[in-house]
């Protein structure tokens, strides 16, 4: 990112970062879609230099692609990182972010308030590969620190926990991580960099499902990893040899020497993306770039509508409880006001009076809301987490995540608020 780009405001960066000037090959103002598998080297020395990480440039679209690179540069600028890696899905982003520094025999400390797929990844898939996880209540900082072991490689949490949008004390988690010379990895999907930039509060690595608010229209899958460039990998070389010592999978390169402050994200691209192939397609990157151009406008409307829905539900006689950070008390409310002064959390849950059958019937009765397993679309969405997104969790895990049989998750869209409220009301009428 140029110095000039760095001086721009968020709303300008979301449109221009990564492509300050027209396409140099065609003079196209819009970002071109480079649908090519590979790139021609002008000579053998250029080819060798690119493979040896001594000369920048494209090799193969599994690793880099001009369209994807613009998306990565734009996201890095918006999050305030030194570099980013676009991948096929949010799940791929989480997996690569963790496996980049943690392997068999290592340990993770993770928040319990996570997307069900992430919980399953940590509890089962990574566990089967020899990587263990201790889950802790994210609000209990003493428990977070107590869970750290000699083989712990990272702390992991979501800035707004899925599905209740519980607010993370990022600075508290970061202080604990850095006290023990560990990086803090956070999922910023529900917040977006427009509402919160975790790197400014101490996060070392940020991941997100770009499928959600970044794309914003439910049309393209994607994930992204952002490197803050601040963690001292070289100073902790024994703990993170893959980043800070000769890497045998890349002919002995030391990524902290070859890439400097971007060592972490360079290793992720050069090894894990190379080997696992969870590549973001240029077409999807183009769609996600289209979404980024209106991110701030959409998020403002999402939040505005959501807060009105929260007020509506909080006074509704058929609602047992609304789980939204604006209604929290004590330290939780302090964190919400501190990190989200303009509001947040258009994805949240409420508990309907009745049974699980009541909750499911309510989701089926809505007409404007779509019953589907996605969030952060311009369209309003609804789902019953206990039987869908979090159905693979045990009863104990559901309780720890704040999910009951009557919990309903809403993702509030950008439609007219009168229409949103009217649809919710007719849903309640259907289950009276």
Where is each model-derived feature located?
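N-terminal "arm"/small-domain region of PLP-dependent enzymes with the aminotransferase-like
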Residues: 2-65, 73-74
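Well-ordered beta-strand positions enriched in small/hydrophobic/aromatic, beta-favoring residues
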Residues: 155, 223-225, 322, 348, ...
């Amino acid at each position: 990112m140029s110095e000039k780009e760095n001086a721009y405001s968020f709303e300008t960066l979301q449109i221009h970062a990564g492509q300050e000037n027209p396409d140099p090959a065609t003079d196209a103002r819009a970002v071109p879609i480079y649908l090519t598998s590979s790139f021609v080297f002008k000579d053998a020395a250029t080819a060798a230099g690119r493979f040896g990480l001594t000369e920048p440039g494209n090799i193969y679209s599994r690793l880099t692609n001009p369209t994807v690179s613009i998306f990565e540069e734009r996201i890095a600028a918006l999050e305030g990182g030194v570099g980013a890696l676009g991948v096929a899905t949010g799940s791929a982003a989480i997996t690569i972010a963790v496996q980049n520094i943690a392997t068999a025999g290592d340990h993770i400390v993770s928040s319990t308030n996570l997307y069900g797929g992430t919980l399953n990844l940590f509890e089962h898939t990574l566990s089967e590969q020899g990587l263990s996880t201790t889950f802790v209540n994210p609000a209990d900082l003493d428990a977070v620190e107590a869970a750290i072991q000699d083989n712990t490689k990272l702390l992991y949490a979501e800035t707004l926990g899925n599905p209740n949008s519980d607010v993370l004390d990022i600075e508290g988690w970061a202080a604990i991580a850095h006290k023990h010379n560990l990086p803090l990895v956070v999922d910023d999907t529900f917040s977006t960099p427009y509402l919160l930039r975790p790197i400014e509060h101490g996060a070392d690595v940020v991941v997100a499902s770009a499928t959600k608010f970044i794309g914003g229209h439910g049309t393209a899958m994607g994930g992204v990893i952002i490197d803050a460039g601040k963690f001292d990998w070289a100073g902790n070389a024994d703990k993170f040899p893959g980043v800070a010592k000769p890497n045998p999978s890349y002919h002995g390169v030391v990524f902290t020497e070859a890439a400097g402050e971007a060592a972490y994200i360079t290793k992720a691209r050069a090894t894990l993306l190379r080997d696992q192939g969870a590549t973001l397609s240029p077409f999807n990157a183009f769609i996600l770039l289209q979404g980024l151009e209106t991110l701030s406008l959409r998020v403002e409307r999402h939040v505005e509508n959501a807060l009105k829905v929260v007020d509506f539900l909080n006074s509704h006689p058929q609602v047992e409880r609304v789980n939204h950070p604006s209604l929290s008390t004590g330290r939780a409310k302090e964190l919400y006001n501190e990190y989200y002064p303009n509001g947040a959390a258009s994805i949240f849950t409420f508990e309907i009076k009745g049974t699980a059958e009541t909750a499911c019937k309510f989701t089926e009765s809505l007409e404007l809301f779509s019953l589907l397993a996605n969030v952060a679309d311009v369209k309003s969405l609804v789902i019953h987490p206990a039987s869908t997104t979090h159905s693979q969790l045990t009863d104990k895990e559901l309780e720890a995540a704040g999910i009951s049989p009557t919990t309903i998750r809403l993702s509030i869209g950008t439609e007219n608020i009168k229409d949103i409220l009217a649809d919710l009301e007719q849903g309640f009428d259907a289950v009276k």
